[in-house]
Amino acid sequence: MRRLWGAARKPSGAGWEKEWAEAPQEAPGAWSGRLGPGRSGRKGRAVPGWASWPAHLALAARPARHLGGAGQGPRPLHSGTAPFHSRASGERQRRLEPQLQHESRCRSSTPADAWRAEAALPVRAMGAPWGSPTAAAGGRRGWRRGRGLPWTVCVLAAAGLTCTALITYACWGQLPPLPWASPTPSRPVGVLLWWEPFGGRDSAPRPPPDCRLRFNISGCRLLTDRASYGEAQAVLFHHRDLVKGPPDWPPPWGIQAHTAEEVDLRVLDYEEAAAAAEALATSSPRPPGQRWVWMNFESPSHSPGLRSLASNLFNWTLSYRADSDVFVPYGYLYPRSHPGDPPSGLAPPLSRKQGLVAWVVSHWDERQARVRYYHQLSQHVTVDVFGRGGPGQPVPEIGLLHTVARYKFYLAFENSQHLDYITEKLWRNALLAGAVPVVLGPDRANYERFVPRGAFIHVDDFPSASSLASYLLFLDRNPAVYRRYFHWRRSYAVHITSFWDEPWCRVCQAVQRAGDRPKSIRNLASWFER
């Protein structure tokens, strides 16, 4: 009969290995967290090198945390200790006492008594470890008496369910939407880019990208010739180009397509011209099924003319916001297909990091929160500033990424604080360059939807800039603690969005998936400014 372990025991010299081998083993994952020596991990079983029970229960009390993008996101940085089982040892001992009683009943010489004793056994709880006393008593005893499935079948079934759960967990939306391959449509989807972003009204159109080659999106026909307007299933408008004088909307509503009696072309005020064009837009239908897509990657603080856009003018939104119709962030983390491969981006050894804090800023404005916080932080720790304006110095010839890689920390300070507004300052300048980002933007919870919580430092975590400076100096003196901010690289890699090719292809992908569902944006400004 299998030996039951009741009272707590200590290792009996060199014989504890034999006792451990004879004891019923728990399933993988039922126990974890090897932290310290000399404590029993379970009543009746002495486990050398396991954590003490106070630490065990303290870690067990930590709530599980998850991330999301568009509601979900990357999994948080693994802390190095797996979750502990939530039951204390006293409760486990109380669960063993009925087991002893049931086994004594099974020794009855009467078959009927034995059957009643078998029926009185507690039912194994769903999800209980297969090697637990409940499973051993219920599952194995039933097999020996010809009741139930063979033990090998049970083990194989449990292994199959475990593999299925792990695959589902790994594949379920832990990251913002990635450019997965789309089914090839019956006919290519045409997407017309009305203005070249930041290129000016008279700039030559760029060659369209190959969506299949670059982003694994097939069935796209990217258009730049406005003569193909009637063939496009979607037309992409960049918001910044809407504010450059009277907008030349597509026909039949374009201002230049009407006489001066209909629209006064002398009016150069953007809001009045846009309102006039939108009034014309309601007079004639668009091509059937065509979607107008509003595209913007600036924050509401730097997006003029939002409130001048009439209701129902656009059908979709494309932006960094996770609740956009077409969500295209500045960057994201994706699971590494081969964990043994070197991490993406730059990760120079600590011996090559000669500086402490770096900051690259292109637009210096004393009114911005990031500049005010810099002045406070620079009083307690040295910050090397690169870029135009303020105390900035030119970026060295080796380039921005290699310059930042020489520093331990990078100030990923956004020019304004809005929902989901997390730009290349985090993804490219810090994470890809191999520096720990110190972020100032939306709150920490917003960042944790897209980035592991142990991959960055938020200014809101500290009551003052001096406290943050003290913590940065502490990490500088403790390399082992500093390296923890790079543990996420073992599981994830950084993707930097390719502007403007990737948004173009992502609109094509969205059209393929949307079907014929109609939609229009009733109040664009109220949605984007919240």
Swiss-Prot record:
Gene3D superfamilies in UniProt: Glycosyl transferase family 10, C-terminal domain
Cytoplasmic membrane side: 1-147
Annotated segments matching region Disordered: 1-48, 66-112
Sequence ranges of Basic and acidic residues compositional bias: 88-106
Pfam family, one: Glyco_tran_10_N
GO molecular function: 4-galactosyl-N-acetylglucosaminide 3-alpha-L-fucosyltransferase activity; alpha-(1->3)-fucosyltransferase activity; fucosyltransferase activity
Keywords, in A-Z order: Glycoprotein, Glycosyltransferase, Golgi apparatus, Inflammatory response, Membrane, Signal-anchor, Transferase, Transmembrane, Transmembrane helix
Locations listed in the record: Golgi apparatus, Golgi stack membrane
Entry membrane topology: Single-pass type II membrane protein
Glycosylation-annotated residues: N216, N315
Record-listed E.C. numbers: 2.4.1.152
GO biological process: carbohydrate metabolic process; fucosylation; glycosphingolipid biosynthetic process; inflammatory response; L-fucose catabolic process; Lewis x epitope biosynthetic process; lymphocyte migration into lymph node; oligosaccharide biosynthetic process
Residue intervals on the Lumenal side: 173-530
Tissue: Expressed in cord blood immature promyelocytes and in peripheral blood myeloid and lymphoid cell populations.
Family from the record: Belongs to the glycosyltransferase 10 family.
Protein name: Alpha-(1,3)-fucosyltransferase 4
Species assigned in the record: Homo sapiens
